[in-house]
Structures are given as C-alpha cells and as structure tokens.
Amino acid sequence: MIKIKIRQYQETDFNRIQEINREEGWSNLVERNEDTKQAWENSTVSFVVEAEGDGVVGYIRGLTDTRTTLYICELLIDKKYRGLGIGKDLLQHVHRLYPKTRIEMLASSTSRSFYEGQGYRPFYGFRKTLEE
C-alpha cells in the first residue's frame, strides 16, 4: 500500500500542480498560469497529496464561508495514482475540517460514478464568464 500525506498547499507546489493539470489536458488552467497561481493564493481550501518518494500526486482547491457552503474548484489526481482512494481521502479531509458545510462542485460526466460512490448527488447549476 502506498503511503500518502495530505498537507496544506505551499507556493513551491504550484509547478507540479500545473504539470498534473497539463497531463490531464486542463489547458485553461495551464495557459492562464498567473491567474491560476493567484487563484491558489486566494483559495480558502488548498491541499495537496504527497506520495512517499514521488512528491505531489494530487490536489484539491476550493472556497468556503466555513458555515454553509464549500465549493470545490478543482480536484485532480495524477493518472498513475487514480483508483487508490486518494480523491476520496481529500474529500473526507476537507469535510472533516468544515463539517457543517455542504460541498458543491462541478464535475465532468466521466467522474459522475466516483462522486456518486462517495454519496454526492447531482444538482443543477449555471455558468457564465464576463466575455459571454
């Protein structure tokens, strides 16, 4: 079994996070590098997962008011480490820190079964950027 550690994000983690984003094809986060870096610096929820001997292999980033809502902006695990329960561990870690909040997130259709398996249910939402 792999030994992992969840810890608070540090600025020195950013380049590795961007590598994971690039490998996943999340080009918007990679191309908007400075905006993404600022997003991490301004996030109230920002944790990484380290695997022993391999460094950062995943992360979770979000925003919360600490009482009612916690919004997950991104949750991503390196492809080599998926299926080991790391994403589940990150979600549980965050929910333990903010037990009174409901967690909300947008997710891809391919991750639906993962989130439903963790007890999350679909909800309806909207999205718009200023340029639209």
Residue positions per predicted region:
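Hydrophobic adenine-recognition pocket in adenosine-nucleotide-binding enzymes
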Residues: 9, 75-77, 111
